[in-house]
Amino acid sequence: MNNVSLIGRLTKDPEIRTFGKGKDSTDLCRFTLAVRDGRDKDGNERTQFISCAAWGAVCEIIEQYVHKGDMLGVDGKIVQNNYEKDGQMVYQTEVRVGNIYLLPNPTNDNSGRSKARR
């Protein structure tokens, strides 16, 4: 079974790329979530920075409603991509997002924001 659920903050605005043209095009959003991961032995908070990718309708929602610093919940699966760069294989692990949840930002009153799920 390959399922992952995360809650974190976006480290910067999502990067959007469009593949194809016209009605056959689809969008890809890439973003990084800063996810709290407990505390170390000295009591300092640990943070994991998780790469995420969303396609199609989920990407469209992210593009419209999600910005740097926003709290976001995601459900998805872990995937590994690989490609060659300068003659070396590069391996990248990321979360392929299936659902998103726009969460309230405790430092900012976003009571007008609604949840979005795809």
Question: What would you call each of these model-derived segments?
Answer:
Residues 1-118:
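Single-stranded nucleic acid-binding surfaces, predominantly the OB-fold ssDNA-binding core
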